[in-house]
Structures are given as structure tokens and as C-alpha cells.
């Protein structure tokens, strides 16, 4: 074995591979091999079957290693073996000295160790090296290997993304593939290998063994297959990761490893199969060569490997069968390539597409198995309710889930879900989520199946039944031997005509990656040549950047990353840091935080002086050095939900209810606490909580099990769900069960099941509880009078009457409130109240239970205590209300609103091309709604952790968000991700604007509280102009007449684009009270007017642009206590404020006619201050309120 040397004359080339350490030359010992590699073990792994001298030359071969250190960090080895004839001057034959021993060939091994699993690439490199070594003399071997190692060590590892690196290695062109994203593994192997070795059913069984963390041993007569096949299975399960010992190749001397008592995944030569099977207990033995799975002898009678959930397994098998796994069939119609490079490129392209299809297929399997996990997570308290999750699984799948849920793999998976990591699993879950699931994810009501869900269940049940009749699902534990080798089966595509649709493999065509060819390295051991190579590398990267389209930030980021690395190798630390800093505005996901931190720590005094000349760079440096303190505070624990064992005060009770997943809203939980503690000490004992929890879950389970005939479902809307069923009662419509949905009451008739509508909640006129006499007994009766029917509905509900009376009145009041306020969220809240009433009555089961439940009758009491009807003008103008805080414990203030029109962009899915409403909530949270249906489009994502001050659509592909933390975050509207940040401001970003009337603006203007104004080029994200105002307090800016109008509180300054002051409107010149300040302003160019609002004033002031020195006109706003925002909509100015509405403080909007300068309308629909306003194409106006309400109202524009 010749590739490892203790002494090296040159600086560490391996630094490229792992990017470890600062750019200074490390200690000599660190240069030889990557840290963590055991040099004593490596030789036996290079010859895992032992060293054997051969009598004739053997075929060259390669195998692959995975080396794990004590901390779990992996390095990867590719070993090439070849044989050379033995040359020895002291070899005697027939009593004479001979230079060569006849028929004696000695094995040699060359091992390349890398921090990354470049299996195919390094195999190609070693193939080229062996072509040099085999014919050369012994004394030439070392020089060739040194040259080879030095050259490899100068090749950088490509950053995550679409850019692959290409370099020449003698006769072959080598491609180093990049990982798809920073979270994904590097894939430089053929993912279809296991599918050639095992039938799909066996693949599923092996995946189950890995998911349940068994003790697994792979066997093969081919050492190379052991690593490649096991690594493929690891890739199949991404983002779930194997957490236990992973040793794909055990040498003959390491066989005792299989006696380890913990979970592991190892690989042995097939020669040791019988030995391992007899000696070790409790092992899963996987024979790659035969495509079979067996178990070590002592466990044959006690196999406990569960089956994958049936529907997911069937879908996976059908998709695998539809894959084209054989390149020969794909290329049968093609001419033979006469160019080696072209032939390899074609094969690589085919493999890339197949790998992508396999990844999609296995990822869909994982999503179908684990998608519903998120429904049983509490993110605030980091709790997973495993028991409730299991109850939602089919009985036949319980064994599978019970075993998987207890594994380290699943625990790590849960952490990622609770951290809201947007990995491949989360992205596919989002992409394949139905509209119904998106909507339901935001509702407060507990899980109840909708009519649409019930219908899909029935159809899927019929489909499964049909599948069972057509083809019996094989028992995945069935390991009957002998088996036909899968390689002998048909090579043609399986006919999947009967299982198309969701079962067919996705027709994924991956985008062709970009490639960058690394310059030639002629003499890698000569320092001058290495310096020339680095200089040439930088020059080529700089040239490539010049030819990029301005908006191609994806590729620009990769070039910047690579150039930064080369600068580091040259010792140009400041240039490297500047390139890395530019990743913030091109693609922050690939920013190498650890590398930059080590670089900063190694900077010399002159380099620090240079860095201090660049304020933006110094800010980056300070952020990097401070990050470890933030990371240490990260809480990543996961708790399983457990019932409490101690008495609970309100705070602890609220936490427990939220953890249970019953309800999150703090105000509702407070009322629930009052209900459960009526007439007793204000604390809840564990038994009461347990009874309440069980009662709630039982009614939830009953609702899941309600069987509705098709005839009944046809009368209901697709999003309706049956939330409560009475017992069988006598009514004036017949005998049956009264059913309640969120929209109506109906009678589910007995005998032949049928549907008789009682009433929708909207049409109810009166609900009364009375009694009726029957056989001298007075029976409690519920009477409901309906607007469109003469006959009053009567139901003899007996003991259920009081509860149903409460529930129907609450739903009726909730529906009336929803209609009056045009806010469907009230219906969801009323439904939650109703179901909690039901659970409270079931829990207490006492004479006072109804009174206790009445504490939850929130909307009914509200309607009785005060009229809730909105003013007529408000009702005429209000179109709809939405709640961005739905699903949160407390309402959150709506800080900023932005409407973006819909575009049919090729990069966007058709269903996502609708207009959108962006709502910025507290702490950098942004929620996006579909502005055509006002349903949730994207659950909240974060842009920093500070308050958002402003948003603007810079072009059709990106939304810019200005934050209190001085950063401008750029959101990609297609991926809904924030991969770019602009950090040129040093204080809070207060406004962002573009030129009015431009569909594709070329510039964005930003300003910050310290008075800095920047002009950004949208394509390049470079600052093209900047100026500093003479004073701070800058809150907003407007463009007009080639001037920039700036509101600084004390004045409104008109600035020329060169930064010089053109004109100024000072507040002290217009008001005697100098304690006031400008809050907001608008320019009306057609009227040549400036409209402004001032702190503490209930008036809007209007100046003429022709002469700002003239006193302003005033528009008084009646009952206004403070103004917060204003916007111009056509010939109106809308002013958002806080004022008196119906005698109480509320959010108010004043609509002022810009020509007559009079208030046309006063709109009152918010319970808290109107904090923000935005216009939707001048057809609608949207308003957002403060944290007491946290809702958005949609108003009809004039």
C-alpha cells in the first residue's frame, strides 16, 4: 500500500477536500492523512481477504471503504488492487541468481482517502493511475504516486448546488458531482444497484430492518458491492440517517465485530456466511449475490421484522417496477459512440436521471409512511404524541410503527421536524399536500375527517380491496428458499397500466448540471507551478463570472465560493472573506461558516487593519465570532406526551393542553380551565385531566369512525365534517341521530340510512329548550325554528337536551358573528368551543356539568351581552377577514402586508401562479395566503428573528423584506425560501420602494433609521448609489419627479439623487407644538399634494407641492386617537388608526376623497389598532391589526 506517506514537502493539499483549518500550512503530521484515519487498520482493509501471492497475474479490482472515528465522523476510501511480478536480485532458482521469480505476482494496493464519498470519481482517478504504475519500474512508482496525490489534493470539492467540477486525469475526464443542497448527501454512485440485486419486496424488507435498527450483516463475494449497496440503502432513507456503527467491509481479522450487542450495519465476504450465521445470534443476514434475506439460527423461530404499511408498500413496488433499470435497453436505438468522452457523458446523464427517479420513489415511500407525524407534534413545547399517532394507523401497521418510533433514527427525524427543517422530506410533503390539508393545517378545530377525506377513504379502500383480489400482497417476512435470482427476470418495463397515477414513478427530468473545468496542473510538486495553477484558477473563475447573466446568482455563488477557496490557498485572506461575504447576497445556504471563522481567527494584524476599512466585512466578522453563543442556546430535545401526575395551576394546565394537541388558543384554554374548576379550588387534579383527555380522544375517535353513506355525503360540502352525533332520538322528522357539522344540522335516519336536513346555522331563527309530555313523563325537548320552514323542528333528546341546546346556540351565534363580520374563523372557534363543552360534560358527569360547560359558550354570551352587527358602511365595504395567527397560542400583530399579482412563470407550478398576500407577523414570521381564495398558501417561515418593517416585490421572482435587525432578506417566490441577504445597512431597515408603474423595476431604494439611503440593482444586488442624510430618524421614502422624498420625523426632506438637499419641510415651521413628529406621508402627483400625519394629532395635513412654505390644509378625523399608516388608492387616501367605534376603542380606517378633502367613510372592523395597509391592484385594500386581534381585513376599493 503506497499512498500514505508521513513526510511531505509541500503544503497540505488535502485542505481542499475537507476545507479544514486556516489557510496557513498546518503541522506536517496533519498533512499526511485526514484526521481520524486509523493507519494500523487501513492495510488490512486494503486487503480485506488477506495478502496472497499469485502464480499468475490477476485482474485489477477496486473496492470502497467507509472509515468512522470515535466521534462518528466518516471518511471514505477507494482502494485499487493490482499485481506486479516479483523482482528480486536475491531470488535464487536452480542454484543461480535470477532478477525475476518465475510465476510469482505480488498484490499492491493504492488507497485514496477523502472526506467525501466520491466513489465513481476516485475509481476513475485510480484507474488512470494504475495505467501508469503497471508498466513502470519499481523506483518510478513512488514519484508517480506522489505526483498523483499532489494533483488530487489541489482539486477542490464543489459547493452544494448545480455546479459540477471537471478535470483531466491522463486518458479520462473526471467529473466531481456536487451535493444537491447543503443538507443532502453527495451521490457519486449508481443507486439502482440494489434494485438489480433484490426484488422490490426484499428492498422494502431491508429498509424495514434498517428503520427498526436491527443488527444487519450484508454478504457478497464482491468486496466492492458491499459498500456500494449499503450506501445505496443509506441514500434511500435520506433524510433519516443511520446512527449506529456502519462498517460495510470487515476484513477477515475483524469478524468478531459481528458479536457486538448493539445495532450495527456491517459487511462480510460471502465465504464467512455460514460461520457468522452459526456463531452470532439475532442477526439479519442479507446475501447480495442471491438477493435473499435470512436470520441467524437462534432467531428463526422468533423473527420480529414487521411489514411496511400496506398501501405505501404497494405503491413503492409499482413505482419500482415501472423504472427503466438497464442502460442497454435505453441505448439500444443509439449508434455506438466513437468518442470515449461523449459515451461516458451519455451514460452519466442516464444514470443521473435514474438516480433522481429512485430518490423520488424512496422519498415518496418515506413521506407516505411518516407524513402524518406532523399532525401530532407540538412545536412550542417540542412534544410528540406517539400514542395518538399510533391510534391513527391501521391495526396491521402498529407493529411497524411501534418499533420504528423507538429508534434513534426516528428521534433524530423528529428533531428535524420540530426545528421545521426544510429538507427533502419536508419539501416533498409540501409539494404533494392537498389543498384540503393545507387549509386544515391552519384550522383551530380538532381533527375530524371532511366529506372529501371520507370519500377518498372509501375509494382507496375499494382500490386496496381490488388490489388484494387481483394480486396478493406478499408477506415481507417470507424468506422461503431457494429463490430465483432477480437478475433472471424480464429486463423490460413492467406493465403498470393498471396502477398508473399515484403509483407510477414520477417522470422526473433533472436539470442538466453546469460544469466548470479546472485548469491543468502540470507539475503539482513544484511550488511555482502550484502558484501558477492558483492564479490561473482565479483568472478562469473571474472570467466565468463576467460572462454570467446578471440574474444568475445561483451560479455566481458557486464561482464566488470556489474563488474564495483558491484565495485562501494563496494566503489572500481578505479577498477570500470578501468573496465569502458576497454569498450572503447570492446564496447564503452555502456560506462556509466554520471555514470563515477559522480564517478570521488566523488573521494577522495587517489583515485586521485591512478588514477594518470595510465596515460590511467587519460586521460579518463580528456576526461569525458571536454565532457559537447563539448555537449553544439551541434547544433540540424531544418529549413524548405524558399525562400529568401533579395538580395544575392555570399556567401548567395551559402547557399540558397545548402539548396534548387538543387546542392551542390561550383564551380558549383559559375558559376551559374555568369550566373544569367551577365551584372548587382553581387547580386541576391529574385524574380530572386524564378523564377530560380520554373523553376528548374518544369522541375524536368516534368521529373518525362515523360511516356516512354516499347518499348522505352527496348533500354535504366537501370540506364539511361531522363533529357530533346524538344517540338515536325521536323527532318530528322521524327516528334517527342528529348530526352536527360546522355548517348545518341534519338527521341521519335509521333503518334505511338517509339524509333529512334540519337547518343550516345561518337559517336558524330560534333555539329553545322545552319539555313534552309522554305517558305522564316530561321529556326534555329541543325546538329549532328555521327561517325557511313553517314547521318547528322538535327532538326528544332527553338527557342530552341541555348539552345540545348549548352547542346549537353556540354554533348559531358563531355563524351569525362570522356572517356579520365576514370572518369564517369565528365558525372554527365556535366549533372548538362546542366540542370542548361535550368533553367537559363527559368528564364531570355531575349535576353541575352543564353549568360548567356553559363557561365555554363564548359567542352565545357575546351575542346576548352586546350587539355585534357592524355599521352599514363597514358591512358594504368589507369583503372578507382572515386570521394569519390561526393555530398560534396568542394573536400576533400584523406588522406589514404585501400583495403580489399572479404570474404564469415557467418556474412556478400552475396552481401556485395565483396572486399572493404576504403577512409579516411578529419576530420575523411571514405567512403567505392565496389571494384568489384567501386560503393558506405557505405556513409561516422566518426571516430573521426581529420585527419586519417593510416589504416590496422587486421583480416577479423575489420579495424583499426589510427588518429591524438591519438586514434585507430576499425571498424566492417559487421556493418560498430565503437564500439571500443584503447587509449593507447598519441600523433598522425602515422602507423599501421601487419606481411606480414599472413591472420589472431595475432598482430598489432602501433606507434605514440612521439616515442611510441605498440604491440597489435588482439583477446584480449591488449598491449603485448611496447617500447619508444629515440627520437620522428616517422612517419612509417616496420617489417623485426625479427626487427622493424622505420622512425623518422632524422634517420631510427632498433629496437630489446625488445626495444633496433640494428642499425641506420642517415640522417646527408649521406647528407650535414641537413635541410632535411626522409619522407617515403620501405624495399625490396628479393633485400636486403632499399628505402627512403627525404623532398625537387626529388630523391629516395637506401641503401643495408648488409651495411647501404655505400653511397646510387640515382634514379632521372624528373620534381618532392615533394615526399609524396611510396609502393612496386611486383618488382616495386610506388612513389606518385607532379610535372610538360604537363607543369602544377599536381600529378605524378613514377613507378620504383626495379631491374634496373630506372623509367619505369610517370603517370599523378591527378590535385593535390598524397597523398596516396595502392595495391589491387598486381593486381591494387590505388592513392588518395589532396583537389584540391580529387579523387581516379585505375591503372593496372604489
UniProtKB/Swiss-Prot annotation:
Residues 1-10 have a biased composition (Basic residues). Coiled coil: none annotated. Residues 1-28 are annotated as: Disordered. The modification Phosphoserine is found at residues 472, 490. Residues 1-163 form the uDENN domain. One of its GO terms (molecular function) is guanyl-nucleotide exchange factor activity. Residues 320-424 form the dDENN domain. It holds the Pfam family DENN. GO terms for biological process: endosome to lysosome transport; protein catabolic process; regulation of Rab protein signal transduction. It comes from the Eukaryota. The modification Phosphotyrosine is found at residue 858. SMART domains: dDENN, DENN, WD40. Keywords: Cytoplasm, Guanine-nucleotide releasing factor, Phosphoprotein, Repeat, WD repeat. Inactive DENND3 is found in a closed conformation, in which the linker region interacts with the DENN domain. Phosphorylation of Tyr-858 in the linker region intereferes with this interaction leading to an open conformation and enhances the GEF activity of the protein towards RAB12. Guanine nucleotide exchange factor (GEF) activating RAB12. Promotes the exchange of GDP to GTP, converting inactive GDP-bound RAB12 into its active GTP-bound form. Regulates autophagy in response to starvation through RAB12 activation. Starvation leads to ULK1/2-dependent phosphorylation of Ser-472 and Ser-490, which in turn allows recruitment of 14-3-3 adapter proteins and leads to up-regulation of GEF activity towards RAB12. This is DENN domain-containing protein 3. It comes from Homo sapiens (Human). The gene is DENND3.
Amino acid at each position: 500500500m503506497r499512498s500514505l506517506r508521513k513526510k511531505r514537502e509541500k503544503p497540505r493539499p488535502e485542505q481542499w477536500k475537507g476545507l479544514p483549518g486556516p489557510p496557513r500550512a498546518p503541522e506536517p503530521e496533519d498533512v499526511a492523512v485526514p484526521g481520524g484515519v486509523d493507519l494500523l487498520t487501513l492495510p488490512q482493509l486494503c486487503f480485506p481477504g488477506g495478502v496472497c501471492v499469485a502464480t499468475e497475474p490477476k485482474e485489477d479490482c477496486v473496492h470502497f471503504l467507509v472509515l468512522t472515528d470515535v466521534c462518528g465522523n466518516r471518511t471514505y476510501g477507494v482502494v485499487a488492487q493490482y499485481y506486479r511480478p516479483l523482482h528480486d536480485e536475491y531470488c535464487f532458482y536452480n542454484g543461480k541468481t535470477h532478477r525475476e521469480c518465475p510465476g510469482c505476482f505480488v498484490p499492491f494496493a493504492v488507497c485514496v482517502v477523502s472526506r467525501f464519498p466520491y466513489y465513481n470519481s476516485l475509481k476513475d482517478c485510480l484507474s488512470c493511475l494504475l495505467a501508469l504504475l503497471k508498466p513502470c519500474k519499481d523506483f518510478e512508482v513512488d514519484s508517480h504516486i506522489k505526483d498523483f496525490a499532489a494533483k488530487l489534493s489541489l482539486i477542490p470539492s464543489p459547493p452544494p448546488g448545480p455546479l459540477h467540477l471537471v478535470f483531466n486525469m491522463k486518458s479520462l475526464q473526471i467529473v466531481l458531482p456536487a451535493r444537491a443542497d447543503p443538507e443532502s448527501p453527495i451521490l457519486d454512485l449508481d443507486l439502482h444497484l440494489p434494485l438489480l440485486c433484490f426484488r422490490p419486496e426484499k428492498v422494502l424488507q431491508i429498509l424495514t430492518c434498517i428503520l427498526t435498527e436491527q443488527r444487519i450483516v450484508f454478504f457478497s463475494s464482491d468486496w466492492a458491492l458491499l459498500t456500494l449497496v449499503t450506501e445505496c440503502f443509506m441514500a434511500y432513507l435520506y433524510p433519516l440517517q443511520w446512527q449506529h456503527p456502519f462498517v460495510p467491509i470487515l476484513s477477515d481479522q475483524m469478524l468478531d465485530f459481528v458479536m457486538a450487542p448493539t445495532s450495527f450495519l456491517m459487511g462480510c465476504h460471502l465465504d464467512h456466511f455460514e460461520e457468522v450465521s452459526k456463531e452470532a445470534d439475532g442477526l439479519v443476514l442479507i446475501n447480495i449475490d442471491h438477493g435473499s434475506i435470512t436470520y441467524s439460527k437462534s432467531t428463526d423461530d422468533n423473527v420480529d421484522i414487521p411489514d411496511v404499511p400496506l398501501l405505501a408498500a404497494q405503491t413503492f413496488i409499482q413505482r419500482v417496477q415501472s423504472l427503466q433499470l438497464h442502460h442497454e435497453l435505453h441505448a439500444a436505438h443509439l449508434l455506438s459512440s466513437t468518442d470515449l468522452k461523449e459515451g461516458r457523458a451519455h451514460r452519466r446523464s442516464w444514470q443521473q436521471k435514474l438516480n433522481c427517479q429512485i430518490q423520488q420513489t424512496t422519498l415518496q415511500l418515506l413521506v407516505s409512511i411518516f407524513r402524518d407525524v406532523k399532525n401530532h407534534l407540538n412545536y412550542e413545547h417540542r412534544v410528540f404524541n406517539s400514542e395518538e399517532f399510533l391510534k391513527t394507523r391501521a391495526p396491521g401497521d402498529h407493529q411497524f410503527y411501534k418499533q420504528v418510533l423507538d429508534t434513534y433514527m426516528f428521534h433524530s427525524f423528529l428533531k428535524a421536524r420540530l426545528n421545521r427543517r426544510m429538507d427533502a422530506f419536508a419539501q416533498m410533503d409540501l409539494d404533494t399536500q392537498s389543498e384540503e390539508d393545507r387549509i386544515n393545517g391552519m384550522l383551530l378545530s380538532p381533527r375530524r375527517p371532511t366529506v372529501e377525506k371520507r370519500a377518498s377513504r372509501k375509494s382507496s379502500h375499494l382500490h386496496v380491496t381490488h388490489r388484494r383480489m387481483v394480486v396478493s400482497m406478499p408477506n415481507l417476512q417470507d424468506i422461503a428458499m431457494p429463490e430465483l435470482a432477480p437478475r433472471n427476470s424480464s429486463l423490460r418495463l413492467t406493465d403498470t397500466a393498471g396502477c398508473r397515477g399515484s403509483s407510477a414513478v414520477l417522470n422526473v427530468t433533472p436539470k442538466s448540471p453546469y460544469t466548470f473545468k479546472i485548469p491543468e496542473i502540470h507539475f503539482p510538486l513544484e511550488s511555482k507551478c502550484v502558484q501558477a495553477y492558483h492564479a490561473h484558477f482565479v483568472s478562469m473563475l473571474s472570467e466565468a463570472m463576467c460572462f454570467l447573466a446578471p440574474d444568475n446568482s445561483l451560479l455566481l455563488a458557486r464561482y464566488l465560493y470556489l474563488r474564495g477557496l483558491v484565495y485562501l490557498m494563496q494566503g489572500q485572506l481578505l479577498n477570500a472573506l470578501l468573496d465569502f461575504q458576497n454569498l450572503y447576497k447570492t446564496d447564503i445556504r452555502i456560506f462556509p461558516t466554520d471555514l470563515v471563522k477559522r480564517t478570521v481567527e488566523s488573521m494577522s494584524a495587517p489583515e485586521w487593519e485591512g478588514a477594518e476599512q470595510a465596515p460590511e466585512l467587519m460586521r460579518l466578522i463580528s456576526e461569525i465570532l458571536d454565532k457559537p453563543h447563539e448555537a449553544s442556546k439551541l434547544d433540540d430535545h424531544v418529549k413524548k406526551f405524558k399525562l400529568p401526575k401533579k395538580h395544575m395551576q392555570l399556567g401548567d394546565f395551559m402547557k399540558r393542553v397545548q402539548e396534548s394537541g387538543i387546542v392551542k388558543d390561550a383564551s380558549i384554554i383559559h375558559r376551559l380551565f374555568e369550566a373544569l374548576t367551577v365551584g372548587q379550588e382553581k387547580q386541576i387534579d391529574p385524574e380530572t385531566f386524564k378523564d377530560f383527555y380520554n373523553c376528548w380522544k374518544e369522541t375524536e375517535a368516534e368521529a373518525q369512525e362515523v360511516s356516512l353513506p354516499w347518499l348522505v355525503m352527496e348533500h354535504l360540502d366537501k370540506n364539511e365534517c361531522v363533529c357530533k352525533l346524538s344517540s338515536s332520538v325521536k323527532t318530528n322528522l322521524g327516528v334517527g341521530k342528529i348530526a352536527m357539522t360546522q355548517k348545518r344540522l341534519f338527521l341521519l335516519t335509521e333503518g334505511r340510512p338517509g339524509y333529512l336536513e334540519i337547518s343550516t346555522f345561518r337559517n336558524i331563527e330560534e333555539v329553545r329548550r322545552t319539555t313534552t309530555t309522554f305517558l305522564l313523563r316530561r321529556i326534555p325537548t329541543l325546538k329549532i325554528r328555521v327561517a325557511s320552514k313553517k314547521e318547528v323542528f322538535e327532538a326528544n333528546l332527553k338527557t342530552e337536551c341541555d348539552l345540545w341546546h348549548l352547542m346549537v346556540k353556540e354554533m348559531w351565534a358563531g355563524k351569525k358573528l362570522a356572517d356579520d363580520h365576514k370572518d369564517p374563523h369565528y365558525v372554527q372557534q365556535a366549533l372548538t368551543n362546542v366540542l370542548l363543552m361535550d368533553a367537559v360534560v363527559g368528564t364531570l358527569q355531575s349535576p353541575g356539568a352543564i353549568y360548567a360547560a356553559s363557561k365555554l359558550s363564548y359567542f352565545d354570551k357575546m351575542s346576548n351581552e352586546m350587539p355585534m352587527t357592524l355599521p352599514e358602511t363597514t358591512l358594504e365595504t368589507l369583503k372578507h377577514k382572515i386570521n394569519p395567527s390561526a393555530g398560534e397560542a396568542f394573536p400576533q400583530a400584523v406588522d406589514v402586508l404585501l400583495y403580489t399579482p399572479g404570474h404564469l412563470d415557467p418556474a412556478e407550478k400552475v396552481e401556485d401562479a395565483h396572486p399572493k398576500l404576504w403577512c409579516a407577523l411578529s419576530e420575523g414570521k411571514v405567512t403567505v395566503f392565496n389571494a384568489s381564495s384567501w386560503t393558506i398558501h405557505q405556513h409561516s417561515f422566518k426571516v430573521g428573528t426581529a420585527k419586519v418593517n417593510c416589504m416590496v416585490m422587486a421583480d416577479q421572482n423575489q420579495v424583499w423584506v426589510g427588518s429591524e435587525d438591519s438586514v434585507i432578506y430576499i425571498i424566492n417566490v417559487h421556493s418560498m425560501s430565503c437564500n439571500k441577504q443584503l447587509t449593507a445597512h447598519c441600523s433598522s431597515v425602515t422602507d423599501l420602494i421601487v419606481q411606480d408603474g414599472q413591472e420589472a423595476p431595475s432598482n430598489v431604494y432602501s433606507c434605514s433609521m440612521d439616515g442611510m439611503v441605498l440604491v440597489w440593482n435588482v439583477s446584480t444586488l449591488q449598491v449603485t448609489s448611496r447617500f447619508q442624510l444629515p440627520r437620522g430618524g428616517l422612517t419612509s421614502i417616496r420617489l417623485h419627479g426625479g427626487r427622493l422624498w424622505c420622512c425623518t420625523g422632524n422634517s420631510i426632506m427632498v433629496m437630489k439623487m446625488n445626495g444633496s438637499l433640494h428642499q425641506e419641510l420642517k415640522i417646527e415651521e408649521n406647528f407650535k407644538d414641537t413635541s410632535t413628529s411626522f409619522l407617515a406621508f403620501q405624495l399625490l402627483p396628479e393633485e400636486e399634494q403632499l399628505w402627512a400625519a403627525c404623532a398625537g394629532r387626529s388630523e391629516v395635513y395637506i401641503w401643495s407641492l408648488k409651495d411647501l412654505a404655505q400653511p397646510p390644509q387640515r382634514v379632521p378625523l372624528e373620534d381618532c386617537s392615533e394615526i399609524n399608516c396611510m396609502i393612496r388608492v386611486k383618488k382616495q387616501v386610506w388612513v389606518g388608526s385607532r379610535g372610538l367605534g360604537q363607543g369602544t376603542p377599536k381600529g378605524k380606517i378613514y377613507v378620504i376623497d383626495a379631491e374634496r378633502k373630506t372623509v367619505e367613510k369610517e370603517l370599523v372592523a378591527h378590535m385593535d389598532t390598524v397597523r398596516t395597509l396595502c392595495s391589491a391592484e387598486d381593486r381591494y385594500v387590505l388592513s392588518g391589526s395589532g396583537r389584540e386581534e391580529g387579523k387581516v381585513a379585505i375591503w372593496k376599493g372604489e
